[in-house]
């Protein structure tokens, strides 16, 4: 991977800012980026990790005083966040990972300042408030992600899925792990994509491709735990263990709808909530369809053998 970095802002202009580095992975985010940058302007360092955007993303970042690092993906791991944690010029102990369609509210900023000054924990989970088609969805919460952490203790989880074709250069549902103590902040991140529903649908089609490979991997592996060991897991690993159970359940699209619309009370979120829950059910259906396609291809490759397989592709 190669990297180019903008000149650092003057230390004079940074003197009164919070000793925090914000990592912002982006690609063609000119619509979302200004609001995201404005919401963390109080941070001492902002690093925008770009993938050679063809719009005004890099120019917007530089104009806001952020450093721009260009990431070149080689088709295999690491992907963008993992690479940035290891290679970006991070100069603060504390790091906040922020997506371009997210905003740090005033309440969350105050909490971040307090916990960094206190230094009682090594990482913090942050909830997300999701704005969907103009409405804040109560059914989406809580949605905890570990986003604030001590840099030296953090790493991206590795599901061995960095080379799945057609899924881009940024992590999808891998999470950050911290070798230390963690806690939960009260105020949420605001998640509001200005690109609208079309971008959401396109993004989740890509996610479904990646998830299909993960589902296939998990279904081909043993569970690897029993009830006693499951009960001893921490919250993060218990969630991962539940996912291995989930991929084995029948009727997942229906279960997904019931979970979101009934158990998580999506029916209280109006027509936007109903639309979101239907789309999440369809998302689960798409994952299953793509997993069936993968199994069919696997069976065909086994049946014809590698040499015949090459000849068929050449003939096509």
Task: Tell me the role of every PLM-derived stretch.
Residues 23-45:
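Short, well-formed alpha-helical segments that are part of the catalytic scaffolds
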Residues 31-34, 55-64, 107-108:
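Acidic helix N-cap motif at the loop->helix transition within catalytic regions
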Residues 39, 50-62, 73:
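A conserved acidic beta->alpha catalytic loop
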Residues 24, 43-53, 69-70, 100:
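Short beta-strand/loop segment that forms part of the nucleotide-sugar
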């Amino acid at each position: 991977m190669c990297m180019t970095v903008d000149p650092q802002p003057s230390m004079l202009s940074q003197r009164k800012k919070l000793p925090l580095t914000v990592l912002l992975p982006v690609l063609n985010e000119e619509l979302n980026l200004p609001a995201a940058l404005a919401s963390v302007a109080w941070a001492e360092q902002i690093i925008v990790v770009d993938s050679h955007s063809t719009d005004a993303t890099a120019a917007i970042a530089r104009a806001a005083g952020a450093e721009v690092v260009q990431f070149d993906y080689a088709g295999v791991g690491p992907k963008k966040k993992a690479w940035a944690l290891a290679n970006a010029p991070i100069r603060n102990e504390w790091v906040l990972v922020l997506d371009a369609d997210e905003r740090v509210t005033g309440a969350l900023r105050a909490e971040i300042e307090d916990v960094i000054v206190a230094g009682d924990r090594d990482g913090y989970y942050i909830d997300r408030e999701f704005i969907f088609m103009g409405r804040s969805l109560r059914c989406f919460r809580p949605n905890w992600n570990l986003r604030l952490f001590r840099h030296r203790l953090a790493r991206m989880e590795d599901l061995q899925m960095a080379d799945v074709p057609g899924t881009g250069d940024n992590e999808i549902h891998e999470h950050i792990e911290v070798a230390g103590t963690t806690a939960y902040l009260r105020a949420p991140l605001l998640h509001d994509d200005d690109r609208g529903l079309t971008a959401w649908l396109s993004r989740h089609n890509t996610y479904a491709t990646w998830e299909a490979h993960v589902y296939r991997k998990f279904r081909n592996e043993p569970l690897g735990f029993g009830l006693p060991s499951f009960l001893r897991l921490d919250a993060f690993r218990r969630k991962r263990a539940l996912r291995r159970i989930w991929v084995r359940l029948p009727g997942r699209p229906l279960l997904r709808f019931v979970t979101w619309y009934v158990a998580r009370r999506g029916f209280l979120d109006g027509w936007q909530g109903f639309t979101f829950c239907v789309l999440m059910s369809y998302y689960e259906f798409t994952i299953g369809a793509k997993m069936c396609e993968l199994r069919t291809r696997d069976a065909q490759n086994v049946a014809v053998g590698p040499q015949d397989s090459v000849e068929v592709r050449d003939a096509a």
